[in-house]
């Protein structure tokens, strides 16, 4: 989160995927989510191989984006965070005494990285079946969603340069 001394942001307008940045042969975009006229969350997102160390200059990327793309020279950083969402299927445990949850339990949509709603749904299921939890079924996304995620990830892997246009058309 950044804060500016002047009112710069329109808190009614968000920018979800700004691809106007260096892609480095992967998929890279920024979010700008204003909280008020002088506070906003600015986030950089990479859809890439986590092993690629050249992408790890996040602070510099954010600084360049804020100053060059948003035109903000005077700001302070209130909060920072870093995270990574795996966009691949986890290998699930074969141990019937382990009930994996979250990303480890296959609850992350591989095409979006979203996990929260699936965790909520599965948590309700676990609570409802807590007395017979060892017999409870393993969480699984529907076959349709698994297929669509695989198609998406294949296109992402083979044609990362096309992803900005694909995302734009998806949300048009």
What do the predicted segments below correspond to?
Residues 40, 100-104, 143-147:
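Short acidic (Asp/Glu) and glycine-rich catalytic loops that position anionic groups and cofactors
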Residues 50, 54, 111, 155:
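Conserved aromatic-histidine-acidic binding/catalytic patches
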Residues 51-81, 92, 99, 120-144:
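Flavin-binding catalytic cores
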Residues 14, 82, 104-105:
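Generic secondary-structure boundary/loop-capping signal
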Residues 24-27, 82-100, 110, 155-161, ...:
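FAD-binding beta-loop-beta segment adjacent to the flavin cofactor pocket
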